Amino acid sequence: MYYYSWPYNYPFLPEMMGFWAFVAFVFGTCIGSFLNVCIWRIPREESIFSPPSRCPKCGHWIRWYENIPLLSWTFLRGKCSQCGNRISFRYFFVELLTGVMFLLVWLRIIFEQKPLALAIIYFAVTMLVITTVFIDIEHRIIPDETTYPVMFVGLAVPLIFPEVWGRDTRLEAFIVSFAGFAVALLLMLAFSLAG
């Protein structure tokens, strides 16, 4: 059992750990469904919030019960319910991957007794990285919409949780983070100049 003051306060008994792990996985799959929207729309410079999702071939608006993470793709056999157009396996895979990653993040937070608030940051970084990777795979681009937030988080987090980088002080953690940021910036500049 864990007895720590906030943010190290875990308000659940050991026998509830399985339940919360399941919640983390399900929450991750729901986020993964949203990431699929981002992966499709960001490269096309479309809003990620509206309009609702639809089939790119026939324009059929996806109903809520056709958009349940993992289950809908499975029951629809990877096809649009109206026109039968194939739905990429990537949708299922991203939902599953995000669910598994959120579960692993949650287990690390719990078993390493890290601040619960840190889970939110890890979740956010996971979302950004997954979105960036799959956009890069499909379009060979790394969008600013995901790159800049990752850089910001990388610089800001050490000021709040220096232990993320295994440092004792915020200054040490920030220096390590800034060094990584500088290297990434130089690489981006080099690739940009190389065309």
Label each residue range with its predicted role.
Residues 1-17:
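Short, strongly hydrophobic alpha-helical membrane anchors
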Residues 35-91:
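Membrane-proximal soluble regions of multi-pass membrane proteins
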Residues 12-20, 86, 90, 110-118, ...:
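Juxtamembrane/transmembrane-helix boundary motifs in multi-pass membrane proteins
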Residues 41-49, 107-111, 137, 163-166:
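Transmembrane helix-loop junctions in multipass membrane proteins, especially transporters and channels
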Residues 29, 33-37, 103, 181, ...:
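Transmembrane alpha-helical segments of multi-pass membrane transport proteins and ion-pumping complexes
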